[in-house]
């Protein structure tokens, strides 16, 4: 059985702790580490995690697709895939119309 962990989506988590959290989760035997788009960008914590891990999969679960340019999103995913040695998994979601229009100021 595979068990995955995550890097703190709640407001009390400090970005400075994410690298250590990732290393602890890998040492504990987790198979993957996931982030979500909440109060932090979902990609940056994975970059931090990549620097302190070597085997776990690293993924977004989820990143909001409609608030980003497809080319920018593809470039970010490609860079993370290269930097992690193929361990990055891109999870995308659509979000709901009010969040896209109000939170991200993007057209629906």
Residue ranges and their predicted role:
Residues 1-60, 66:
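N-terminal beta1-alpha1-beta2 module of alpha/beta enzyme domains
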Residues 60-61, 91:
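A conserved short beta-strand
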């Amino acid at each position: 059985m595979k068990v995955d962990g995550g890097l703190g989506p709640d407001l009390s988590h400090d970005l400075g702790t994410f690298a250590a959290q990732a290393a602890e989760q890998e040492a504990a035997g987790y198979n993957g580490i996931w982030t979500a788009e909440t109060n932090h960008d979902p990609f940056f914590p994975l970059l931090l995690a990549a620097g302190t891990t070597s085997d776990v999969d690293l993924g977004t679960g989820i990143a909001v697709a409609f608030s980003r340019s497809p080319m920018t999103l593809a470039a970010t995913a490609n860079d993370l895939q290269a930097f992690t040695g193929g361990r990055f998994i891109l999870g995308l979601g659509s979000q709901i119309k009010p969040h896209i229009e109000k939170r991200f100021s993007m057209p629906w």
